[in-house]
């Protein structure tokens, strides 16, 4: 009995399995292409063979996608029938399940489903983070994880050198060759148009690699004439801890760099947090530039300061994968359970964050100074939900305390005041009268503003 072409194809696949070509090869598998792969390693590649609508991140799967993934896994791995009713959830909920949860919902196949999901997550993660940089067919602007915003033309270009073959991918990591052309604010020379086949990748990150120091800029035209040529130096890009990139199905020949011995390594570390760094003249962000010594070891380099105006002209907005910075926000002045102005002033004096607005001159004598009257008025306005509060309006409320001998202005001193009573002594008095006076003062201010 002769075999049909379909049966021959299935038989051939069982004998020798060849992973399908993909524009983004799997990072998890280190087995060379076109080599028979054992059954134990097939799970590393099987997620690529998922149906097209399941090739998204599992967190974006709908409930129907989860059910179809269970059905696909049951057929692909010859598992026992899986009750899809025990997995009535979307992809986000599926990722919350532990291995024990999978075993509880599917006693016979739960461990396989859990491991398969972990392999899918492992393969999808580097595909999003690194594919725009290492595969020329992909566009950076289509990836939501990496945003490179550029408003000015850059003089630094990135050219990819020749890709390694599948045999020497571990020995010779691919490099990115950065070509630096010096800039002069006075003279501009004509630059030849780049080779369209090279397709340089331009980004604001290029300027962070090499930047002329202020001393070098001060040398003027002499430095411009000496450095008016491109200086290539290679950078070895390592997206994984194995320090290599996966091979591509189609090699792209490029002229190799003449300085291969001085390769610099950039370790791309994925981070769960993509925190935006908005670079503007009010913020100074220092990026550490690692340098390689002659023996190949990393040494900490000097920070590259990005607070200069000319640097900011080339780097406006960069999405950098870093941990969130510590919060140093200016306090807005809202204090709970604080209705009266004297109590509010006492609370501010007890908080060191407000020393730029008000502070003690002599705490024993209860003498305080208003450092920033307009800023203090804004804090009081924020506390009272009065955005148009001014120091003149706030000082009217202070005058009521003069009459009640609670606060006194120091004679001959500007913006220097003294508390005549302690908070306990003030609270034991007629606080209801104080609240009435301050409320009346605010009502009069609102009425006057409405009349205007």
Swiss-Prot record:
Q: Which domain of life is it from?
A: Eukaryota
Ranges of biased composition (kind: Polar residues): 158-174
UniProt-listed SMART domains: ETS, SAM_PNT
Covalent link Glycyl lysine isopeptide (Lys-Gly) (interchain with G-Cter in SUMO2), residues: 11, 288, 302, 403, 421
Under CDD domains, the record lists: SAM_PNT-Tel_Yan
Quaternary structure per UniProt? Can form homodimers or heterodimers with TEL2 or FLI1. Interacts with L3MBTL1 and HDAC9.
Q: What family, per the record?
A: Belongs to the ETS family.
- Designated name of the protein: Transcription factor ETV6
What is the scientific name of the source organism? Bos taurus (Bovine)
State the taxonomy lineage.
Eukaryota, Metazoa, Chordata, Craniata, Vertebrata
**Gene designation:** ETV6
């Amino acid at each position: 009995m002769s075999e049909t072409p379909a049966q021959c194809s299935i038989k051939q696949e069982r004998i020798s399995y060849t992973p399908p070509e993909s524009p983004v090869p799997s990072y998890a598998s280190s087995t060379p292409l076109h080599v028979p792969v054992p059954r134990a390693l097939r799970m590393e590649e099987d997620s690529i063979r998922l149906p097209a609508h399941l090739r998204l991140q599992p967190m974006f799967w709908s409930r129907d996608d989860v059910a179809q993934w269970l059905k696909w896994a049951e057929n692909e791995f010859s598992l026992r029938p899986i009750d899809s009713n025990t997995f009535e959830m979307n992809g986000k909920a599926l990722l919350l399940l532990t291995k024990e949860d999978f075993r509880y919902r599917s006693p016979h196949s739960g461990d396989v489903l859990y491991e398969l999901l972990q392999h899918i997550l492992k393969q999808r993660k580097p595909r999003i983070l690194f594919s725009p940089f290492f595969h020329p067919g992909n566009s950076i602007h289509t990836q939501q994880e990496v945003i490179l915003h550029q408003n000015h033309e850059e003089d630094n270009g990135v050219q990819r050198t020749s890709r390694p073959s599948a045999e020497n991918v571990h020995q010779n990591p691919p490099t990115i060759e950065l070509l630096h052309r010096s800039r002069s604010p006075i003279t501009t020379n004509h630059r030849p148009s780049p080779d369209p086949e090279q397709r340089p990748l331009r980004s604001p990150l290029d300027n962070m690699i090499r930047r002329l120091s202020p001393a070098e800029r001060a040398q003027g035209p002499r430095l411009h004439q000496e450095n008016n040529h491109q200086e290539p130096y290679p950078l070895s890009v390592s997206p994984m801890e194995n320090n290599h990139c996966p091979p591509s199905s189609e090699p792209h020949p490029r002229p190799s760099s003449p300085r291969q011995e001085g390769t610099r390594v950039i370790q791309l570390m994925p981070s769960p947090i993509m925190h935006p760094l908005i670079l503007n003249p009010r913020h100074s962000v220092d990026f550490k530039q690692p340098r390689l010594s002659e023996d190949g070891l990393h040494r900490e380099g000097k920070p590259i300061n990005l607070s200069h105006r000319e640097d900011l002209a080339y780097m406006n907005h960069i999405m950098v994968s870093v941990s969130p910075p510590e919060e140093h926000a200016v306090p807005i002045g809202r204090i709970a359970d604080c209705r009266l102005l004297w109590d509010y002033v006492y609370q501010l004096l007890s908080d060191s964050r407000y020393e730029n607005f008000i502070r003690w001159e002599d705490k024993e004598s209860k003498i305080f100074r208003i450092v920033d009257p307009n800023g203090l008025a804004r804090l009081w306005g924020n506390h009272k939900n009065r955005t148009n509060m001014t120091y003149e309006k706030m000082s009217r409320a202070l005058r009521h305390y003069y009459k009640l001998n609670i606060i006194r202005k120091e004679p001959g001193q500007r913006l220097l005041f003294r508390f005549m009573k302690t908070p306990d002594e003030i609270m034991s008095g007629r606080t209801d009268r104080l609240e009435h006076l301050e409320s009346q003062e605010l009502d009069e201010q609102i009425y006057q503003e409405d009349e205007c």
